[in-house]
Amino acid sequence: MEQNPQSQLKLLVTYGKEQGYLTYSEINDHLSDNIINSDQIEDIIQMINDMGIQVVEKAPDSDDLILHEIKRNNETDEDIVEATAQVLSTVESELGRTTDPVRMYMREMGTVELLTREGEIDIAKRIEDGINQVQCSVAEYPEAITHLLEQYNRVELGELRLSELIHGFVDPNAEAVHTSITNHINTNSEEHHHNDNTEENNDDDHLVDPELAREKFIALKNQYHITNYAIKTKNRNHQDTLIEINNLSEIFKQFRLVPKQFDHLVINMRKMMQKIRIQERNIAKLCIEYGNIPKKALLNFFSLQKTNQIWSKIVQNIKKPWIDKFNTIKPDIQMILKKLQKVEEETGLTIHQVKNINKRISLGEAKAKRAKKEMVEANLRLVISIAKKYTNRGLQFLDLIQEGNIGLMKAVDKFEYRRGYKFSTYATWWIRQAITRSIADQARTIRIPVHMIETINKLNRISRQILQEIGREPTPEELSERMLIPEDKIRKVLKIAKEPISMETPIGEDDDSHLGDFLEDTNIELPLDSATSASLRSATKNVLSGLTTREAKVLRMRFGIDMNTDHTLEEVGKQFDVTRERIRQIEAKALRKLRHPSRSEILRSFLDD
């Protein structure tokens, strides 16, 4: 059985340490046949030399060996083991080095272990815990609940769909269902492959029951009013108020908000926190420059429960040499503190409470983000296995992987472990949907809508069936009859389905000509037409030269020969200062002369057959 390169190199280093030297032939015998790059071989020889092992053309004499043996005896076994491990790790990285992005991606992906069903549930629970932590924190921000209730009012008025507000509801008492349907779903997943291009709204997430949603929102609204009443009549830190706030959080975290609504609530909280930080930075800048207050002390001031306490602490820490200078910026600091108090009035929370809520939101988001990252990285192999089936359809393999990864991330966001099926079963649909959608949108030079792509695929499938049945390509009439689509639409689809081709496409075996060389340029006159026109002009000029000057000019003006346009009898008459009747007579006489066989024969050959 052939050993791997690392094992062979380890034996080589051990052998070299024992005898004190290595010959080039011994190195060549021990190295794998896969190592053929001269740079890799040079690196290996250099590292062996650095370990104190001589690399020579032939075995050295006995004196040199004795000297090397004395030097080698000074080295401990630990030193040898450490040096061997170092060279092995270095060579291992050299052997695995590649510039191919697909191989680099595969190698990085291979370091992540696959998940078991229990591992998936564990990560899904961590994601859910992180989201619950965010929602429980947001529930303490009154504006968030108000916004959600306002959005539900829009749903009841028909201005917003319920599916645009929530995905559904989480039952905290429900456990993951272990069913036997998973294998059945996996078995039949290929049968539903033709449904990959359906809209995202038609995924396997069940539609939210409007009656259940109404009950949940009524419960949320009632608890919100109870909590507000407790805050107004009692202190927010009162035991009864804290119980009501906790009840509100428990109800609110059961709502599975769509990402857009969830982000809106968090962003509003972030904006409020940003306002506070801006004002605190302004206070810190003034106090440090004009009051000589240490920055560390200021940070302690900003952690106080009430805004008015910040001002008193600042005043207490101003030392005598700085009092006069600080008095000049008193109004500015008091103005900033008023802005902070305005934020407290808008939110109904103290600055300390807003910071606390924001901190818990950040921790919850970080927890959910880490868990989602683990779930995505553990299922990257699934994306590659699906993307392989869609190669040669107009997109690079790496592009297919990236689009599939986007679908995988959507699946992680929407996965519900309580349903009982494995994550891979659910994610497969989203990955396929993302890949097929990207192929429809990006694979063609001229984008075709998704619904038309489906029609084209159906037409191609039926066309192949008819070809197998009758042995020839079907006509548009036959396709129309089989697909129950009007014939004119069939012709339109066939026209759209044609792929564009580059004019630089090589033609012939030598590739010395391109397709564009054989296409007619309709903007340029054909050589035959150009030669015919030149001959006609010459013949006409020759024929007219046999007439009188007056007759030739009348014919030129009447028929627009060598002129921009023709002229009427009156216009020609004015030119010659005669009547239109006289011009008509001159024209008739000149035409009779041209009809003479000696002249007409010259022009007759130009008449169209």
UniProtKB/Swiss-Prot annotation:
Gene Ontology CC entries for this record: cytoplasm
Motif residue range(s): Interaction with polymerase core subunit RpoC: 399-402
S-S bonds: none
Residues covered by region (Sigma-70 factor domain-2): 375-445
Function: Sigma factors are initiation factors that promote the attachment of RNA polymerase to specific initiation sites and are then released. This sigma factor is the primary sigma factor during exponential growth.
Subunit structure: Interacts transiently with the RNA polymerase catalytic core.
Protein name, as recorded: RNA polymerase sigma factor RpoD
Protein's organism: Buchnera aphidicola subsp. Baizongia pistaciae (strain Bp)
